[in-house]
Amino acid sequence: MRLPAMTVAALLTGCAASSPPPLYQWTGYQPAVYDYLKRDKDPQQQIDALEKSLQEIRAKDATPPPGFHAQLGMLYASVGKDGAAMEQFGAEKELFPESSTYMDFLMKHKTKQP
């Protein structure tokens, strides 16, 4: 009776350990969007936080989540760094082609936000 219980436990342990890695690395993105919506931090602080998160994501050889580069691009545009904004919008389009229509809109109608 003891042997079958050990076998079942070993099988369950083996199954639990084989989970796939996450598709995207969300490091710092969700808090950054929350801060943006609450307007608790100025845009440059938010840019700094997202750039740091992006470095951490790249260090793990992972992919940032959808919207990460778009958010960073909108923050760059809000502080007048249009070149950096366009670069981020382009990165979003490349990683997530389904965002192309919106990224093209932002690239065409970039405006400085209050």
Where are the predicted features?
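Sec-dependent bacterial lipoprotein signal peptides
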Residues: 1-15
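Bacterial Sec signal peptide processing site at the extreme N-terminus
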Residues: 11-32
